[in-house]
């Protein structure tokens, strides 16, 4: 869908916020977000809020409301998640064709992924999130699957002639081999539950403990999707991190060790989907401005090397649980 935010000017934003009954007593501070448009403001009581304008056409109303309901359900079970505010019973508002929601503005430090105490704490809450997610299925949110994460991106990249002609054979050759490996791996018969979906360290703030934000990509998939992005560094470091994460996680939710074989396939899916996401959003002026390297030959040479490296990772033995597991 062709769309940009050119009509989303300050007057329209403030008129939209007025619909909620809040009265702005500050300027608008634009926060870092490419998929949506997010602004911080202060009301006349000097309370800080964040308003998010969803990209029209990306999610249906039912899908957004299901995201909000999931956040509310997690909050009801005392899981620290940022949930939108309801105004007259409605969390999703709309103005001039722009769907939007408002949150209390929450501050916090960056989650220290290399801090094992913090990592175990995050593991406990992910176990609790997944306990809720396993008992409340999504009906409108999308599935984490190879069609949307691999096949559709492959078609988009080929049809759009994004890859320089001199590199296309090498790029699509390694991409197609990677897709075959991932498709085979993703046939693994494991439970699919309701997930945060984009649980990387940047979506966890630290206050007196973890605070999970941005459920915009919540979806149905294997539990490991919310865990693998916590792992970084060399293999032995990832092994320690995994052990620590699961020590907290399994206090609340049993983990199926077979899912460890999905870490590299899921990483591969994220890599490919990201390339297609940039291509899909290129007509939004924010993207050429912030990702000017995307349509350069150097970038695509790098991606060929990245795909080759990821193909080798797919062929390597997966991480395993420590002996006590």
Residue positions per predicted region:
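All-alpha amphipathic helical-bundle segments outside canonical DNA-binding/catalytic cores
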Residues: 141, 257-267
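ATP-binding pocket architecture of kinase catalytic cores
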Residues: 43-138
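Active-site activation/catalytic loop segments of kinase-like enzymes and analogous catalytic loops
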Residues: 223-254, 270-286
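Conserved NTP-binding catalytic cores of kinases and kinase-like/nucleotidyltransferase enzymes
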Residues: 1-86, 320-325
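A cross-family kinase active-site recognition segment
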Residues: 112-169, 190-192, 290-291
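Active-site acidic catalytic loop and adjacent metal/ATP-binding pocket
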Residues: 35-51, 84, 180-227, 325
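ATP/Mg2+ or Mg2+-diphosphate-binding catalytic cores
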Residues: 276-325
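A glycine-centered beta->alpha junction motif in the catalytic cores
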Residues: 56, 100-113, 154-162, 274-290
